[in-house]
Amino acid sequence: MNPEANENSAFVAGPKWFPVDNDGIFQLADIDYVATYKAMEELLQTGKVRAIGVSNFSIRRLEHLLKQTEVVPAVNQVEAHPYLTQPDLLQYCQGKDIFIQAYSPLGNNQTGEPRTVDDPLVHQVAQRLGMDPGVVLGSWGVQRGTIVLPKSVTPSRIAGNLQVRELPEDAFAQLNSLERHKRYNFPSRWGHDIFDEVGEETAKKMGKEAGPENKTKFTV
């Protein structure tokens, strides 16, 4: 089997941001991400951009990319928080001088599940240190060598995000212990195994099962 089969999936071009068929199944196109990245490399030569990077790349996909391109990505933007530490990916990227940008550093509530920032242990650590729970998680992310990307539109929260500081070793270790490989952002409804975790056949099945909900949720 070709390990790169079904590797290059993207939404088909069209007027809709989220193209689904009559059954609610996402319509994917075969787009070569290596070719796309090479085009981004050419942009560097124009001076119009200063750096290029990738998002949601596994170690396997990074290795495939690096073998065929010249410029090492400046960043790999992935979901990361104490519930999803991805230590192997972090170590690999650090060894290649690729920064990890952590999105959803507090977890999110898109699925209605409790967020990482709401974990009782996070609040215990925050109370003991006299810190906001969100700032605690931001501090944890910076301390482990990642670029943390918290989202906020509130001026006070934006200012608070700048109050990160080094955590005591025991507090840092406590937060590390929360690891459970929990993803809040898992696009299984797309029908593509983007994270190399469930297999393409399972991902396609999950995409079909999500079809009825997709038809009502993704209308633009």
State each model region's role:
Residues 2-220:
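Beta/alpha (TIM)-barrel catalytic core signal, keyed to glycine-rich beta->alpha loops juxtaposed to Asp/Glu
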